[in-house]
Amino acid sequence: MNNLRVRFAPSPTGAIHIGNIRTALFNYLFSRSEGATFVLRIEDTDLERSSKEFEELIFKELEWLGIEWDEGPDKPGPYGPYRQSERLEIYHKFAQKLIEEKKAYRCYCTPEELEEDRRKAVERGDIPCYSGRCRYLTKEQEEAFIREGRKPVIRFIIPDDEVIEFEDMIKGKITIKSDTLGGDMVIVKSDGMPTYNFAVVIDDALMKITHVIRGEDHIYNTPKQILIYKALGFEIPKFAHAPLILGPDRTKLSKRHGNTYIGQYRELGYLPEAMFNFLSLLSWSPEDNVEIMSKEEIIKKFNFRRIHSANPVFDIEKLNWMNQQYIQKSSIERIVDLAIPHLRRAGYIDGIDDMVYNWLKDVISLYKDGLQYVAQITEKAKMFFVEEVEYSDETVKILNSPNSKIVLEVVKKVIEEADEITEEYVKDLLKKLQKETKVKGKEFFMPIRVAITGEDHGPELVKIIPLLGKDKVINRLKKAINLIK
C-alpha cells in the first residue's frame, strides 16, 4: 500500500441504491489498481433514519459483490472510529475552532424568520440565500436569544465574491462562484449534530483521504467543502465526480425504472461477478473493449482516466445478457443451490434429500443456459412442480388438431404398461409409435408436448417425460384427451 487513500461513506438509512454501489466499486477499483487503502466509513448522523440493520445490510451487499475494505467499523485502523455517530466530539472541537477564529458563528434565526427571508427573495426574483442576519451579533444579543429559549445552529461564513476552482479528475476544471452557494451555511444543527458538508471534510481530512470519488450530484457540495478545508488549514484532496446512472428514458435512475437497489438483484438470483462486471462498465471501459471480464481482469485493466463524463444508461437487457453468460459458465450445483430458496418460496419443494437434490439438478439443467437470472426458474420449470398444467386457447387448438387423440391415447396406453421410464425408453417409444400411428414430426410431437407440459415449446420430450414421472404424465394425458372435442 502507498499513501493514496479513498473511501466509501454510505448512510445506513435504507437499502443501497445501484448508483451508490457503483461509487463504492469505482473507489474499490481505484484502490486495488493503484495500491491505495480503501476505507469504509458509516455516515450515521441522521439518528432518526439510521439503523444497525441497514449498516449490516451495507456490509452484506459489499461483501456479496466482492468489494473488500481495508479499514472500517469492523476493521480498526489508525484513523477511527469509522462511524460518524462516534466522532461527535471531534466535530464540535473543529466547529469551536472556527467560531474562535471568526470563521463561523452561532445563528439564532427561527424557521419562521428564515422562511420569510426566502419568500422575500423569491418575490424580488433573487436566489434564496441566508441573509447573514446573525453574523455580527453582540454578546448581549446572543444572551437575549438564549433567554428566549432559542437553540442556535452554527454557520460557516461563506466569503463574498470568491471564485472556487478545482480540477475534477473526470470532468476537468470546474469553477463556481461563492455567491451561488446559498450564503453562510449551517455546519452544526441545533441538536448538536454536524451537517454532511462539515462532517465529511473533518473525516476525510483526519482519515487522510487523498482522492474523493463520488457521484456528480455532489459537485455543488465540493466548493463548500473546499472552503472548509481552507478555513481549517487542511490539505485539499483530489475530487472525481462520476456521472449519474440514467434509466432507459435518460432520466435519473429511480424506482419507476424498476429495481434500483443492489439487494433486489441479489434476491432475484443475479450473480455477484456478473453485477461486478456490469456495474464496472457503467462509465468505464477497458482499452481492448472486452465486455465479459473477471474481477481480477477488471482490476488489472482498470485505469481511472478511462472513466468518461457522459451519463451511462442502466440497460437491464444488457445486464440480463451478461448475467446469462455467467450462469452458463457456473456449475449446476451452484445454480441449484441458488434456485432452492426460490422454489421453496413458491411452495414447490420442502425437505431435500440426495434423491430430490439430484432430481432438481436434472430439472434445472434443462433450463440453466436460458436463465437470465435464477428466480426465473420458478416460472420456467413450473410444470415439474404442479400437479396439473393449464392450457391456453392456442394450446387447446393444438390438442384439437387432426390425429391428436389417436397419438395421445396410444402414448398413454404404452406408458401405463411401462415398468420404468428412462430417456432411452422414451426415445425408442416415440420412434416406434410414429411408425405405428403413421403420424410424424410436429403432428405427432406437438400434441404430446402440449398435453404433458401445457406449452408448445421447451426442453426435449425424452428428458421431460422421465423427470415428470409416470403418474403425472398419465394424468396429464388423460386430462388432455378429455379436452379434445
From Swiss-Prot:
This protein is called what?
Answer: Glutamate--tRNA ligase 1
UniProt motif 'KMSKS' region: location: 252-256
Key word Cytoplasm present in the record?
yes
Output the Gene Ontology terms for molecular function. Answer: ATP binding; glutamate-tRNA ligase activity; tRNA binding; zinc ion binding
Primary location:
cytoplasm
Quaternary form?
Answer: Monomer.
Q: Which organism is it from?
A: Thermoanaerobacter pseudethanolicus (strain ATCC 33223 / 39E) (Clostridium thermohydrosulfuricum)
Q: Where in the cell is it found?
A: Cytoplasm
Its EC number(s): 6.1.1.17
Enzyme class name: ligase
Please provide the record's keywords in A-Z order: Aminoacyl-tRNA synthetase, ATP-binding, Cytoplasm, Ligase, Nucleotide-binding, Protein biosynthesis
High-level lineage: Bacteria, Bacillati, Bacillota, Clostridia, Thermoanaerobacterales
Family affiliation:
Belongs to the class-I aminoacyl-tRNA synthetase family. Glutamate--tRNA ligase type 1 subfamily.
In which domain of life is the source organism classified?
Bacteria
Q: Which reaction does it catalyse?
A: tRNA(Glu) + L-glutamate + ATP = L-glutamyl-tRNA(Glu) + AMP + diphosphate
InterPro entries tied to this protein: aa-tRNA-synth_I_cd-bd (IPR045462), aa-tRNA-synth_I_codon-bd_sub2 (IPR020751), aa-tRNA-synth_I_CS (IPR001412), aa_tRNA-synth_I_cd-bd_sf (IPR008925), Glu-tRNA-ligase_bac/mito (IPR004527), Glu/Gln-tRNA-synth (IPR000924), Glu/Gln-tRNA-synth_Ib_cat-dom (IPR020058), GluQ/Sye (IPR049940)
Q: Which GO terms describe its biological process?
A: glutamyl-tRNA aminoacylation
Biological function: Catalyzes the attachment of glutamate to tRNA(Glu) in a two-step reaction: glutamate is first activated by ATP to form Glu-AMP and then transferred to the acceptor end of tRNA(Glu).
Record's signal peptide: none
Per the record, GO CC terms?
cytosol
The residues that hold ATP are: K255
Motif 'HIGH' region, chain ranges: 10-20
